[in-house]
Amino acid sequence: MEQFLQGPLVTLETLGDGNQLIAVGGFDVSLSEPPYFIETAADWNGPNGIAHREACLAQLKAFGVGFGVCHSEFIITENGPVLVEINYRSIGDGREFLLNNLAHFGWFSTILGLHLGRRLDGDYQIHGSAHVHYVVAGHSGVIDGGSTSFIQHDDDIITQQQVLKTAGEHFQQSYSNKDYLARISIVSPSGRNLDQALQNALSNFDLAPTREVAA
């Protein structure tokens, strides 16, 4: 449905204990140009998600969401947020580990605790800054380059690069998330600006498909 609605995409991550539903935060998601629908980046607690958070949360409550962890997606239209997807699970694609690193509580242990009957007592909003950047291949070819996966700590800023293709691999562009060459995740629990860390990672990234020459 997302590809037929006009407007930015946001997520809302919630925790519920059966009595209360808490919005812990969400991602503002950047997408590729139409007609394809590929996520290219995501910012934790971006301006669109913050501006429409209460309206999004109200829609989930009206739908009956109230227990456990839930990952929902909305399109922000000129008439407000439109609910397009509810998943009764944690957000995935590596962002669950990002939230565990960013939160002041254990993301996974809290989810398990809810199913053991524990209540949500205290502050479960996740603050700080986080950015996820997907390096997307622009064409088919043989993967070439030397970039590898790593985790780097620079004071409060943690950069994690996960390489998703290997050198020598024959790659066929599919205009989907199968075109990802790597995922770069950067977090700062204290909320520091992440722009320089992202630029450093991208400037050192060396992996791309080379065009095959027909014989």
Please annotate each region the language model reported.
Residues 1-79:
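Internal nucleotide-binding/catalytic subdomain
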Residues 3-5, 88, 100, 190:
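Structured beta->alpha junctions
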Residues 6, 104, 177-179:
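Short Pro/Gly-enriched coil loops immediately N-terminal to beta-strands
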Residues 26, 84-86:
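Beta-strand-dense domains in secreted/periplasmic systems and polymorphic toxin scaffolds
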Residues 33-37, 93-98, 206-207:
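A short, polar/proline- and glycine-enriched secondary-structure boundary/capping micro-motif
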Residues 50-72, 78, 87-141:
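Active-site "cap" helix and flanking loop/linker of ATP-utilizing ligase/carboxylase catalytic domains
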Residues 76-82, 175-180:
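A short, glycine/Asx- and small/polar-enriched loop/turn
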Residues 110-215:
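Peripheral (often C-terminal) accessory segments that flank ATP-dependent C-N-forming ligase machineries
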